Curated annotation (Swiss-Prot):
Region spans: Disordered: 94-263
Predominant cellular place of this UniProt entry's protein: cytoplasm
Stored SUPFAM superfamilies: Initiation factor IF2/eIF5b, domain 3, P-loop containing nucleoside triphosphate hydrolases, Putative DNA-binding domain, Translation proteins
UniProt-annotated location(s): Cytoplasm
Species in which this protein is naturally found: Pseudomonas putida (strain ATCC 700007 / DSM 6899 / JCM 31910 / BCRC 17059 / LMG 24140 / F1)
Protein name: Translation initiation factor IF-2
PANTHER family assigned: TR-TYPE G DOMAIN-CONTAINING PROTEIN, TRANSLATION INITIATION FACTOR IF-2-RELATED
Stretch list, region G3: 401-404
Family from the record: Belongs to the TRAFAC class translation factor GTPase superfamily. Classic translation factor GTPase family. IF-2 subfamily.
Region annotation G1: where it falls in the sequence: 355-362
G5 as annotated region, ranges: 491-493
Record field: compositional bias (Low complexity): 136-148, 158-176
Lineage, highest ranks first: Bacteria, Pseudomonadati, Pseudomonadota, Gammaproteobacteria, Pseudomonadales
Gene (name only): infB
Length: 846
């Protein structure tokens, strides 16, 4: 057993020697010097003493303080708020069990003493009250005893009668005094009882003595004056408590009763309805409808849109009456209110000029109008629809000039719908092109007759028969070949054949017998719309029927307004416009979509109601289409990487150009990159457009528009990419280049040379060295290689050493021998092939 001195023990426990000796003396050990030996038993004794002393200190009462802080916000008028902080502090003191027991014992003794004192006092009061009552009864019996004895006595005997007279007179006075004393004692008793009850309630015990005394008091103390008061109190308490409460309950009871049978509701179902709306109309919970449809085998959610037939089936199965309504009921009622009555008259034909780009459509129309309009278009290319009416020698004709570029498919389709006759312009030296075929398809779909104008007939190489052959393939047969389509040879530059073309157009118009009602309210179609900075929304309208006048309230798609001003195609103000007349109108609350129908309505309230309805319907259709697209593509996009997206904010001068550019740009891209037009509109580039581009990391494109000062400032500060264009080709080409750059590059491997192993040598520096013959290409040093055995790749690494004879070589050409050392590979065998290649990055294209 190892012996330890006091000094060594002090060093071990890291305590001063004097303190350790003092603790050992307190523990009863005989150690007084630092050199004395301490045994294990003495160590145990010292440890026990220290533990007991620490425990006694730990068991002393300790005070615990808890602080709690609560912060809340108090809102005052406006957007102001006040922060309220509540701090609470609680102190807990742990007391010894002896103190707690002593306090409980003391409280119990005090409670018992108070109960005994209250009981003695109450018993004394009851005893005194009983004695007074007995004395009062005795006095009453003494006063009543002489009254019957006075009747048989004769009248002269006055002395016996006079003796009890004072007693009879004093009886009521003593009775009143006794009643007052009893009343005072009763009040005092009631106060004592209430105090006793409060004490019992505070101590948590039931007032047993008070209840017994109270019962006795009610039974034994029916005093004459206290009884009416008690009755009043009881009746008043009953009136205020029980009676009043019951009457109040009766007044507050509702007359609703649960239905004894199923309630049949009248359910109105439109063309589409959500599950929650259907449940609300049937007065059931949405979960019940969802559960019912699950039982029918159709899993739905509470916000899912149901068609009319499904909703009708559900409502009828649940026992309700169904009323089907059309979503277009509001528009139908508006159409019925519009009356087109009056005498019909012949109207001018609306002619649309179609054809491929640069085939001379605008130049031909320009020659007809005797004005140089094409010079105003960028690059001589029509960017949006132009509407003009022309007075010719043979009558008035309205022309619509549509763009020929591939991006303007929707604009050409709208032009075909709004027109009566289509002039198909085909260049004699170019033939039938893609947009020519598309124009033929639009004309056939709209059921509009065609007049073919073979333009540029004065150029060398013009071949009319070739045009006839190519168009006959598309189903357009010339009159010379037995068809019904007139072919006219024209030259927009020289004016050749223009008169014959107009004659053919007017002949077709006479065959169609075009009529209109000028006296009816105006009705037309939106050819184009734009946002003018000074005049607001401007819409180009082609009046198809009736007369449009300044001041009319019009409904145009999802927009409405009063016509504040009308301008003709030359910019001159006009008061009214008849059938087949194109005009620009001002006063709408927004820019309508090209192709929207315009109607004159009599009531502004009705116009606003229908416009708001159409806006909501358009929003619902858009959301439904987006939801359907997500459901259809959920499995196709599962597991695919996220596409790289080029965000664009696009602003144009007219609505048609915006739609065309959105369609063209949206069609660009592939599985890896895409174009997303996050913001588009008509008008100049504003500060909000620049902020949108900044927030979404987009490129700003302006087509025939410019940015204002606020937008330019943001573009300069943030370094945004903003570009101006006036030709649609440039936008599409730049976006294609940007997408090509986003695609990155591909890594392509080019095989530089192949060497065949003829022998294997051992080198102390490089290990196995392959003696090879270059059989193809050139072998280079420090290039990646592959080792092929039986045309199977068994190793891929790097060519570390290349020598010819004893000299290092940078390259060895075909037909020459060399020694090749492969880095980190020694399993080279005779007959293997070493293939040297390089990796080249190649730019990708769309």
């Amino acid at each position: 057993m190892t012996q330890v001195t006091v000094k060594e023990l002090a060093q071990e426990v890291e305590a001063p020697v004097e303190r350790l000796l003092q603790q050992m003396r307190e523990a009863g050990l005989p150690h007084t010097d630092a050199g004395q030996v301490v045994t294990d038993n003495e160590k145990q004794t010292l440890l026990t003493h220290l533990k007991s002393s620490h425990k006694s200190k730990a068991e002393e009462p300790r005070k615990i303080t808890l602080q709690r802080k609560t912060t809340s916000t108090l809102r005052v008028a406006g957007s102001k708020s006040i922060s309220v902080e509540v701090r609470k502090k609680k102190v807990f003191v742990q007391r010894s069990p002896e103190e707690i027991q002593a306090e409980q014992k003391r409280e119990l003794e005090e409670r018992r003493a108070a109960e005994n004192a209250a009981r003695d006092k109450v018993e004394a009061e009851v005893r005194q009250r009983n004695e007074e009552q007995a004395r009062r009864q005795a006095a009453g019996s003494t006063a009543a005893a002489p009254a019957p004895a006075a009747k048989p006595e004769p009248a002269p005997a006055a002395a016996p009668v006079a003796a009890p007279a004072p007693v009879v007179a004093d009886a009521p006075a003593s009775e009143d005094a006794a009643a007052r004393a009893a009343e005072r004692k009763k009040d005092e008793t009631r106060r004592n009882e209430s105090r006793t009850r409060d004490d019992d309630r505070r101590r948590g015990e039931a007032p047993r003595v008070s209840i017994k005394v109270k019962v006795k008091e009610k039974e034994k103390a029916p005093t004459p004056r206290a009884a009416p008061r008690t009755t009043d109190e009881e009746s008043d308490g009953a009136r205020r408590g029980r009676g009043g409460k019951s009457k109040l309950k009766k007044r507050n009871q509702h007359g609703f009763q649960n239905p004894t049978g199923p309630v049949i509701r009248d359910v109105t179902i439109g063309e589409t309805i959500t599950v929650s709306e259907l449940a609300n109309q049937m007065s059931v919970k949405g979960a019940e409808v969802v559960k019912f449809m699950f039982k029918m085998g159709t899993p739905v959610t509470i916000n899912q849109v149901l068609d009319q037939e499904t909703a009708q089936l559900i409502a009828e199965e649940l026992g309700h009456k169904v009323t089907l309504v059309s979503d277009t009921a509001l528009e139908d009622s508006l159409a019925e209110s519009l009356k087109f009555e009056g005498q019909t008259e012949s109207r001018a034909p609306v002619v649309t000029v179609m054809g491929h780009v640069d085939h001379g459509k605008t130049s031909l129309l320009d020659y007809i109008r005797r004005a140089k309009v094409a010079a105003g278009e960028a690059g001589g290319i029509t960017q949006h629809i132009g509407a003009y009416h022309v007075e010719t020698d043979r009558g008035m004709v309205t022309f619509l000039d549509t763009p020929g570029h591939a991006a303007f498919t929707q604009m050409r389709a709208r032009g075909a719908k709004a027109t009566d006759i289509v002039i198909l312009v085909v260049a004699a030296d170019d033939g039938v092109m893609p947009q020519t075929r598309e124009a033929v398809q639009h004309a056939k779909a709209a059921g509009v007759p065609l007049v073919v104008a073979v333009n540029k007939i004065d150029k060398p190489g013009a071949d009319l028969d070739r045009i006839r052959n190519e168009l006959s393939v598309e189903g357009v047969t010339s009159e010379d070949w037995g068809g019904d389509t007139p072919f006219v040879k024209v030259s927009a530059k020289m004016g050749t054949g223009v008169d014959e073309l107009l004659e053919a157009v007017l002949l077709q118009a006479e065959i169609l017998e075009l009529t209109a009602t000028p006296t009816a309210p105006g009705r037309g179609v939106v050819v184009e719309s734009r946002l003018d900075k000074g005049r607001g929304p401007v819409a180009t309208i082609l009046v198809q029927d009736g007369t449009l006048r300044q001041g009319d309230m019009v409904l145009c798609g999802s927009n409405y307004g009063r016509v504040r001003a009308m301008l003709d195609e030359n910019g001159k103000p006009v008061k009214e416009a008849g059938p087949s007349i194109p005009v620009e109108i001002l006063g709408l609350d927004g820019t309508p979509e090209a192709g929207d129908e315009l109607s004159v309505v009599a009531d502004e309230k009705k116009a606003r109601e229908v416009a708001l309805f159409r806006q909501g319907k358009y929003r619902e259709v858009k959301l439904a289409r987006a939801h359907a697209g997500k459901l259809e593509n959920i499995f196709e996009t599962m597991g695919q990487e996220e596409k790289k997206t080029l965000n664009i904010v696009l602003k144009t001068d007219v609505r048609g150009s915006l739609e065309a550019l959105q369609g063209s740009l949206g069609g660009l891209g592939n599985d890896e990159v895409q174009v997303r037009v996050i913001g588009g509109g008509v008008g100049g580039i504003t500060e909000s457009d620049a902020n949108l581009a900044l927030a979404s990391n987009a490129v700003l494109f302006g087509f025939n528009v410019r940015a204002d000062a606020g937008a330019r400032k943001i573009v300069e500060q943030e370094g945004l990419d903003m570009r101006y264009y006036n030709v649609i080709y440039d936008i599409i080409e730049d976006v294609k280049k940007a997408l090509t750059g986003m695609l990155g590059s591909d890594v392509r491997e080019n095989i530089l040379g192949v060497a065949e192993v003829r022998d294997v040598f051992r080198s102390p520096k490089f290990g196995a060295i392959a003696g090879c013959m270059v059989i193809e290409g050139t072998v280079y040093r420090n290039r990646p290689i592959r080792v092929l055995r039986d045309d199977v790749v068994i190793f891929e690494g790097e060519l570390e050493s290349l020598r010819r004879f004893k000299d290092d070589a940078s390259e060895v050409r075909s037909g020459m021998e060399c020694g090749i050392g492969v880095k980190s590979y020694n399993d080279v065998k005779v007959g293997d092939k070493i293939e040297v290649f390089e990796k080249v990055q190649v730019a990708r294209t769309l």
